[in-house]
């Protein structure tokens, strides 16, 4: 009935939108919805940043480190096996022990990376490593056996083993390391990304401005200066925005430091260590072959150039705690390169006895001693940079502790404050 519908529209519980009570109801609904929507967006954004920070610190970085160490252990095992052969039928026990330790470490790191489930992207590389590592160790064992018996076939087995390492195992290990390092880079980039954070903070400011404008409008209509509910909502919003801004900016600064002065220089130094191992392997294989093979010498020069470039880059990237070790590594590398030139002259003169002593001897000026000190300096620098990453990443990840729940509770408090404050005004019209 028309009259009945008109009467219903005039009921106090259903004020028209053009009236003050009707506008208050619309404002209340809009503010509550805006607060809840912003709270959901803020909680989602913070959750993504916190999850990415945890991914970088607790998962990606350890796996990247394991893949890096696996590569280094494999390369060092090959160098150690080759160097031990040069000592004759009874190489020092320390070399045998170091070789076994490298193989055990590489196997353990391979298991750790495989257990993490790298997926199809590196599945083939992991399968190659698992299948071919026993093949490599078999060649080395055969070479060492023949060498201990005085048979010349030992060097052939070691050369085949080295080919297996450089053509199959190390490329597969490099693929695994590149994949895990890319995951670490992606997680760090997501944890330090700004676009969604800026949108969320801007949305919070917009909601806060809407609450402020509603307070002004209500004050003019009701001639009351303050609305307690809206005031509480404003306070909750301010706390949420300040907390988020401080956590995001502080956490981002820590995570950027973890990357810039931790994982990035550590990766550069790891690549330098790999180049050093490559050069040392070429140096010893040149002695084993005793053919004056220019390929080994050319490969040594290539690795030498890579090592020099990487050490120069690391010197500008590393944290202060690693600077001394990086400088020492550059000094040892330069001395090693100079000794290698002397060894090449002895090689050309066919003075293999003096060349062997210069390359594998442990006198203070020998290539062996310089390489050992270079490895120690690189290891110390890598550990120092990794410690910077661990400390800074932990601080960056910790900045998000409790923030997801805190933002959600504060957003609910904002919505409740708006609903309560405006409901009190509506009650005055009934």
How would you label these PLM feature ranges?
Residues 268-271, 277, 281, 312-317, ...:
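Mature extracytoplasmic or organellar-lumen-exposed domains after removal of signal/transit peptides
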Residues 34-35, 41-44, 341-344, 348, ...:
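Polytopic transmembrane helical bundles with strong interfacial aromatic enrichment
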Residues 52-125, 256-328:
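Membrane-proximal N-terminal soluble sensing/regulatory segments of transmembrane proteins
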Residues 39-59, 241-261:
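N-terminal membrane-insertion alpha helix
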Residues 184-199, 389-404:
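Membrane-interface helix-start motif
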Residues 2-3, 9-26, 196-240, 247, ...:
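Juxtamembrane interface at the cytosolic side of transmembrane helices
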Residues 120-191, 323-375, 393:
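Polar/charged, Q/E/K-enriched amphipathic alpha-helical segments with strong coiled-coil propensity
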Residues 6-12, 169-187, 203-215, 372-394:
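Juxtamembrane amphipathic/hinge helix adjacent to a transmembrane helix
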């Amino acid at each position: 009935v028309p009259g009945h519908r008109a009467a219903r529209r005039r009921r106090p519980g259903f004020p028209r939108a053009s009236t003050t009570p009707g506008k208050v109801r619309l404002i209340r609904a809009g503010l509550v919805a805006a607060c809840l929507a912003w709270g959901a967006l803020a909680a989602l954004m913070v959750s993504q940043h916190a999850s990415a920070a945890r991914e970088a610190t607790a998962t990606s970085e350890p796996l990247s480190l394991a893949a890096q160490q696996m590569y280094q252990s494999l390369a060092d095992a090959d160098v150690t096996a080759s160097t031990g052969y040069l000592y004759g039928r009874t190489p020092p026990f320390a070399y045998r022990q170091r070789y076994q330790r490298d193989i055990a470490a590489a196997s353990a790191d391979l298991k750790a990376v495989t257990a993490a489930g790298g997926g199809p992207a590196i599945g083939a590389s992991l399968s190659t490593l698992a299948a071919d590592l026993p093949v490599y160790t078999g060649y080395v064992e055969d070479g060492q056996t023949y060498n201990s018996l005085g048979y010349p076939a030992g060097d052939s087995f070691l050369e085949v083993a080295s080919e297996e390492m450089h053509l199959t195992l190390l490329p597969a290990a490099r693929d695994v390391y590149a994949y895990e390092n890319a995951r670490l880079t992606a997680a760090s980039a997501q944890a330090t990304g700004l676009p969604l954070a800026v949108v969320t903070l801007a949305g919070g400011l917009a909601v806060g401005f809407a609450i402020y404008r509603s307070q002004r409008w209500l004050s003019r209509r009701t001639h009351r200066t303050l609305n307690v509910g809206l005031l509480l909502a404003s306070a909750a919003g301010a706390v949420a925005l300040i907390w988020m801004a401080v956590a995001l900016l502080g956490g981002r600064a820590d995570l950027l430091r973890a990357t810039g002065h931790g994982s990035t220089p550590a990766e550069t130094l790891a690549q330098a260590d790999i180049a050093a191992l490559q050069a040392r392997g070429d140096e010893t294989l040149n002695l084993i072959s005793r053919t004056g093979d220019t390929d080994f010498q050319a490969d040594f020069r290539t690795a030498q150039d890579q090592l020099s470039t990487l050490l120069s880059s690391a010197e500008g990237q590393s944290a202060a705690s690693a600077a001394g070790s990086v400088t020492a590594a550059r000094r040892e590398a330069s001395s090693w390169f100079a000794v290698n030139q002397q060894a090449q002259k002895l090689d050309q003169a066919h003075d293999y006895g003096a060349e062997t002593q210069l390359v594998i001897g442990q006198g203070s000026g020998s290539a062996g001693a310089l390489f050992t000190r270079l490895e120690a300096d690189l290891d110390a620098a890598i550990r120092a940079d990794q410690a910077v990453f661990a400390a800074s990443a932990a601080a960056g990840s910790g900045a998000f502790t409790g923030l997801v729940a805190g933002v959600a509770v504060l957003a609910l408090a904002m919505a409740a404050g708006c609903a309560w404050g405006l409901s009190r005004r509506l009650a005055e019209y009934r």
